[in-house]
Amino acid sequence: MNHDQQIVTRFYMAVDALYALGEIKSFRHFEREIGADHSVFYELRKNERKRTFMHPAWLRHLVVTYSISADWLLVGEGAMFR
């Protein structure tokens, strides 16, 4: 898995963790929050081989809105949450 795929994988790990904690009501609700097309969001979530690109605004939303650590999200260092 290349570096870009690792970032996308951590993005979806964070989304799953936020859903499990009840911070995200549903994946559809989160898709609307970030302005994501359902089919794109779903395909990236389910198909690891297609994880070659992530919208920067989606990453920023996790960092700003949900206190996900940018260090963890981008380079895999430290804890998931700030």
Predicted regions and their residues:
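A short, Lys/Arg-rich alpha-helix, primarily the initiator
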Residues: 1-29
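Residues within the alpha-helical elements of helix-turn-helix
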Residues: 33, 65
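Pre-recognition alpha-helix immediately N-terminal to the DNA-recognition helix
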Residues: 10-13, 40, 58-61
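Recognition helix of helix-turn-helix/homeodomain-like DNA-binding domains
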Residues: 35-54
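Hydrophobic/aromatic-rich, well-ordered segments within soluble, folded domains that form packed cores
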Residues: 68-70, 74
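Short, charged recognition helix plus adjacent turn
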Residues: 1-2, 74-82
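Key DNA-contact positions within bacterial/archaeal DNA-binding proteins
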Residues: 28, 39, 71
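Short, basic-rich loop-to-helix N-cap that marks the start of a DNA-contacting helix
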Residues: 24, 48-64, 80
